[in-house]
């Protein structure tokens, strides 16, 4: 018998009055808009950004099943805080290795750190909401097994990070784990916090020429053509409109530190 706190995750996926066709159409529309933004050059990309955001927000609003089903309540929050602790442990190891290799490029002060990454921290929560509460919730109704829905949602998440091999591998690892943890605890907050911790760790520990400033899609290819040598100064992501963190639009800034240590 499954633990009592795990079963509601499956039961909540059954919504009376919703058809499988509607779920499939909504997934296709949202994911198609995401990919169109990732692979469209500016200035058209800006228009698609707003179109994608508006359409996905409308789909979420018209199908919202409540805070509890979305993992926005307090249920199992304390039980799942170990996920945050695990992310902090991974981050500490990565930072230590990066410091040893002299690739660490964290902001020079706590204030600079907060101002550089607060937007990315919020965006991490948005990504997890869309992965778990939009795609996973619909795939749970389309596929016969929860683990199949978790793998399918994670697969969509990973494909949105092409052609960046570094980020595809990381999302293949994180995506299924995040989905399965959500199904077990049905609480989004620890996953969002862990996502922010791990993403910021990548931003400050991995040189930009390795992960192409965390770009995906057309932005990744343009970086590859235009900048082949290791940069001495890492620019903010705010001047790039094709970032890997754009699970919705691929355009939200990751705000990497402006100070890049030489490797």
Predicted regions and their residues:
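Structural signal for the C-terminal ends of transmembrane alpha-helices
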Residues: 59-68, 97-98, 181-185
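Functionally important transmembrane alpha-helices
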Residues: 168-226
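N-terminal polybasic/positive-inside topogenic patches
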Residues: 229, 253-260
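Function-critical hydrophobic alpha-helical transmembrane segments in multi-pass membrane proteins
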Residues: 106-159
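Short, Lys/Arg-rich, polar N-terminal cytosolic tail immediately upstream
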Residues: 1-17
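Juxtamembrane "helix-exit" motif on the non-cytosolic side of transmembrane helices
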Residues: 36-41, 96-106
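Alpha-helical transmembrane segments in multi-pass membrane proteins
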Residues: 16-64, 79, 83
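Membrane-interface helix termini and inter-helical loops of multi-pass transporters
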Residues: 68-72, 99-111, 212-215
